[in-house]
Amino acid sequence: MSQTPPPKDGKNPEAMEVEDAIDEEILKMSTEDLKSRTHLLDNEIRIMRSEVQRINHSATTLKERIKENTERIKVNKTLPYLVSNVVELLDLEDNTEEEGANVDLDAQKTKCAVIKTSTRATYFLPVVGLVDPDELKPGDLVGVNKDSYLILEKLPAEYDSRVKAMEVDERPTEQYSDIGGCDKQIQELIEAVVLPMTHKDRFVNLGIHPPKGVLMYGPPGTGKTMMARAVAAQTKSTFLKLAGPQLVQMFIGDGAKLVRDAFALAKEKAPAIIFIDELDAIGTKRFDSEKAGDREVQRTMLELLNQLDGFQPNDDIKVIAATNRIDVLDPALLRSGRLDRKIELPHPNEDARARIMQIHSRKMNVNKDVNFEELARCTDDFNGAQCKAVCVEAGMIALRRDATEILHEDFMDAILEVQAKKKASLNYYA
């Protein structure tokens, strides 16, 4: 086996590498200097080890303290909260520093809060608590500790339970195709309510503001509520259904509070659609009256006017109102800027009546010889609801004679039944 020949100067290559790695200053030092230098380094290592041990001990102590505080916070948060409202948030300047002391400009101002509890007591909190003060604003509902009054949690906004019940959770199943003879009205409703929510960019490109609200008016049974239900079914927005008589309350200010809470809930869950049925219950023309009930109804309408065209309008909230008596509504409700678009739903014509009866009988076992055009000619002055009643009554007549399908004669008998219940032309206006 061949061996590597030693270098000419007689030095080992490994020793040469070690010498190259050592600083020249150390190579020039004497043995005594090297010993003292090594002793100093040993002392520094000993000091650093003790410092590491001290830091580890401090970290362990802090972890235990954090664990204790976390358990204490958990215990405090499981206690029943005292419900309070934030009245005001203050920037408190700390001027207690001694003259000439170093001042931290970032920590010079601290956020403080003034709260009012459900016991009608008002407290000033120099320390807010567990909630970031930047997340709070006056009027927020918070849960505080009943002993220290520190804010433990921000609670959801409080709404009237009657307003929460107005939100439609289960979507209606109606579609635009279920409404016959109202193609123009459906198009106007889609343009005013649905398009601003689904295609907002088209309005921005044209530089126009969509209508804030829609008023549907016409005789009873012409499909006003059904159109609103179709809009609720076709849009993914929050849908609130209010009835005018619901807003007429016994106590002063109760109806106005319902209107305020309804719009506040719609603003929180925007985009939202508010449907007010039977608007004439609260929207009648204002007049001088000494009765407290009349004045309360007028106050409710004034709150509705304020929400429709208030100081802070919201384009993500659309209002659909329906009424049979547009002639008694207050002019302030009808002016532009509030209920901008008025959609009239008149009695259906002959073609519309035929279409309505075809829609309501499409799932029924109807004989192919049924002539809906002839039925439409026989149902003069019928509204949409009465046309639907004809289909239902025809099915009941066929059921009465144990038939498997509905004949044309059943529809004719049903028309006579509905006309007999009608007896005379009804007058819906006083």
Swiss-Prot record:
Gene3D superfamilies: 1.10.8.60, Nucleic acid-binding proteins, P-loop containing nucleotide triphosphate hydrolases. Disruption phenotype: RNAi-mediated knockdown results in larval arrest and up-regulation of the aspartic protease ddi-1, indicative of proteasomal dysfunction. RNAi-mediated knockdown in a ddi-1, png-1, sel-11 or sel-1 mutant background results in reduced or failed expression of the proteasomal subunit rpt-3. Keywords: ATP-binding, Cytoplasm, Nucleotide-binding, Nucleus, Proteasome. SUPFAM superfamilies: P-loop containing nucleoside triphosphate hydrolases. InterPro entries: 26S_Proteasome_ATPase, AAA+_ATPase, AAA_lid_3, ATPase_AAA_core, ATPase_AAA_CS, NA-bd_OB-fold, P-loop_NTPase, Prot_ATP_ID_OB_2nd. Coiled coil: none annotated. The keyword Secreted does not apply. ATP binds at residues 218-225. The keyword NAD does not apply. Component of the 19S proteasome regulatory particle complex. The 26S proteasome consists of a 20S core particle (CP) and two 19S regulatory subunits (RP). The regulatory particle is made of a lid composed of 9 subunits, a base containing 6 ATPases including the PSMC3 homolog rpt-5 and few additional components. Component of the 26S proteasome, a multiprotein complex involved in the ATP-dependent degradation of ubiquitinated proteins. This complex plays a key role in the maintenance of protein homeostasis by removing misfolded or damaged proteins, which could impair cellular functions, and by removing proteins whose functions are no longer required. Therefore, the proteasome participates in numerous cellular processes, including cell cycle progression, apoptosis, or DNA damage repair. This is 26S protease regulatory subunit 6A.
